[in-house]
């Protein structure tokens, strides 16, 4: 998803009950993944640990119509009377969902319209280290989150960054070994 952020920020397999599942979205913090994959951060760590790894594989650069993982177990593509159909129906009934709005994948670096998702900037920070850049997420226009913890992540080609909110420094962070994003997880909005 592009521009969707869920709290608390958690990392894990999309097949588990992660925030956003009930509304068929994926958090733009990009810390979740399908059971057969990993996050970009995990993939890069393996590449950096094992320099003999020749490259990486990204499935896919663009979101696309079809394979709405983790929501591909919905009723739209299943034959009634099968175990898969019955399991999907039970899950949707528990969530009180009558229609499944999900029709596209969530894997892309760009969305269906070609707009850059937050993960675009994460990939750019790794793939183009010579290009000075920083991308801060999430957006910062949530009056309803006042007083609540709202983690801030920074994707940067630099080695470190300092986060300021309303002119006040929340400190500098330096990328550690096998760290590809800078995180301020205790920021209060």
Predicted regions and their residues:
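Extended substrate-binding grooves/exosites of carbohydrate-active enzymes
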Residues: 1-174, 181-189
């Amino acid at each position: 998803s592009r521009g969707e952020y869920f709290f608390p920020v958690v990392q894990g397999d999309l097949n588990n009950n992660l925030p956003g599942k009930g509304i068929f979205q994926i958090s733009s913090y990009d810390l979740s993944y399908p059971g057969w994959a990993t996050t970009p951060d995990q993939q890069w760590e393996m590449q950096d640990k094992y320099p003999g790894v020749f490259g990486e594989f990204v499935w896919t650069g663009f979101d696309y119509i079809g394979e709405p993982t983790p929501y591909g177990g919905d009723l739209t593509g299943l034959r009634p009377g099968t175990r898969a159909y019955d399991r999907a129906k039970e899950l949707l009934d528990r969530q009180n969902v009558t229609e499944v709005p999900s029709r596209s994948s969530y894997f892309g670096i760009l969305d269906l319209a070609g707009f850059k998702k937050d993960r675009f900037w994460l990939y750019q920070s790794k793939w183009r280290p010579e290009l000075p850049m920083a991308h801060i997420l999430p957006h910062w226009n949530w009056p309803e989150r006042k007083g609540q913890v709202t983690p801030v992540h920074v994707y940067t080609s630099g080695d470190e960054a300092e986060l300021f909110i309303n002119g006040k420094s929340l400190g500098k962070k330096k990328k550690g070994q096998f760290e590809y994003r800078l995180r301020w997880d205790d920021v209060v909005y």
